[in-house]
């Protein structure tokens, strides 16, 4: 069988070389600690450049400014940071030992993701690329579950794990948001409207 992980996001979780969390996860748009970093990045790059590069404006939802906040305000944590993960990629790492992230989630890491080339591309010098996970598509197989994860979870050693994605993307797919014009409203701790449009 296969396991697919979907968890809250986008968020930021710095981990050390063993994959252990160095601090509590920094949540999505409800966490506004990186307000100054958003302003600074918009001043240095121009909002239109950021939007064209990553497909999103910088907001409290964006992970890139939060990484910059971490560097500026918690250098002790930043110094130990091996990878920057999300809740989904943290769980996938616990299951497989591999650091991966799906493209949909990566697009929320502005200004670190190039939406046209579909790759990491830090146009602002916010984060060394080696600290970011390998990019995959959410349905790609990352690999088999590790023996220790099988023991912890009770899953079979024959289980494979997909890259997975964040909660909103999984929910959109589950309710049929697949074509231009489709949309959904997601109610949770916050409310999101997700709509597919046929434009770039």
Where are these regions (language model features)?
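A glycine- and small-aliphatic-rich helix-loop capping segment at beta-alpha/alpha-beta transitions
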Residues: 16-25, 75, 123, 178, ...
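Gly/Ser/Thr-rich active-site cleft segment
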Residues: 15, 50-166
């Amino acid at each position: 069988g296969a396991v697919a992980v979907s968890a809250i996001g986008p968020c930021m979780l710095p981990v050390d070389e063993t994959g252990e969390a160095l601090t509590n996860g920094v949540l999505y748009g409800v966490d506004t600690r990186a307000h100054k970093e958003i302003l600074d990045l918009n001043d240095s790059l121009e909002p239109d450049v950021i939007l064209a590069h990553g497909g999103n404006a910088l907001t409290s939802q964006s992970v890139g400014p939060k990484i910059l906040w971490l560097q500026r305000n918690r250098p002790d944590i930043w110094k130990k940071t091996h990878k920057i993960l999300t809740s989904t990629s943290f769980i996938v790492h616990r299951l497989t030992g591999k650091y991966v992230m799906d493209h949909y989630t990566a697009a929320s890491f502005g200004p670190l993701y190039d939406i046209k080339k579909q790759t990491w591309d830090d146009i602002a010098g916010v984060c060394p690329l080696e600290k970011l996970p390998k990019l995959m598509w959410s349905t790609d197989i990352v690999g088999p579950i590790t023996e220790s994860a099988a023991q912890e979870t009770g899953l079979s050693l024959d289980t494979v794990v997909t890259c997975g994605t964040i909660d909103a993307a999984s929910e959109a797919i589950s309710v049929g948001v697949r074509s231009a014009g489709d949309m959904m409203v997601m109610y949770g701790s916050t409310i999101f409207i997700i709509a597919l449009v046929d434009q770039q």
